[in-house]
Amino acid sequence: MTSAPSSHDGQVAIVFEDVFISFAGNEVLRGISFRLPVGETKALFGVAGAGKSTILKLALGLLKPDSGRITVLGNDVTEMKEGELFGLRGQIGMVFQESALFDSLTVSENVAFRLMEEHGIYDADIDRRVREALRFVELEHTVNMFPSELSGGMRRRVAIARAIITHPELLLYDSPTGGLDPVTSNTIVELIMKQRDVYKTSSLLVSHRLQDAFTMATHQFDQSSNTLRALPRGQYCDVPMSFLILRDGKVIFDGDIRELAHTKDEYIREYIS
């Protein structure tokens, strides 16, 4: 799999500029602004209804803001038509809490689904890439199984394989560990970190578990041992990671773990405690 361009190129994967959106007269996002540099990871937090998933839908062009500007991979999605957005989404991998696998298709067919939309790819190449993606999530043995034969955690891992098979420039995760037990959640987080540290793919992660993001900020995937390695105190992973916290539709924090640990904001201190 290929990696995204380095953030040192000065490129930005996502930019939100003063974005507002309301539903039925209820203002969900109020002047949201943030940037995700290429190759970096940003974790979004906030109480239920804070607008985290709405941000992902806006980035995909599934929703249009009432005002403001959203740029994704250099494209102004607020001005794009559906046909143009379809092409852009082909450069984005998505993993949601509900893995949404097709029960009538095998694991192999599910993972290959997005490749089927591309032209000029030989069956042998599709099979190779499917096995490569499943090997990455350590599920190559499930290639001929059906989703009904998999556990919830395994289904989520297949969803990750499907998201990365097209070598996306951007990954969007919407509560990828939601509904999973702690052990399985840790497995999913490890795979997300593996993708981050091996391929440096730009990622926007919505999570309800602060523990997941703290693990990501204080550990690094070690390719030689195929395990996570805790970083020495004061050392941080090679791939920059930041935290964005929402409250009442506004960004109240956007910074790294050092800044988060030293914040004076009482609401944030209580939220992360």
Where are these regions (language model features)?
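Conserved ABC ATPase signature
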Residues: 146-150, 154
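Helix-to-loop junction immediately C-terminal to a conserved catalytic motif
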Residues: 60
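Conserved ABC ATPase "signature" region
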Residues: 75-76, 123-142
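Catalytic Walker B motif of ABC-type/P-loop ATPase nucleotide-binding domains
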Residues: 171-174
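Conserved catalytic motifs of ABC-family nucleotide-binding domains
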Residues: 167
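The feature captures the beta-strand-to-loop junction immediately N-terminal to the Walker
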Residues: 45-47
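Conserved ABC transporter NBD signature motif
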Residues: 68-76
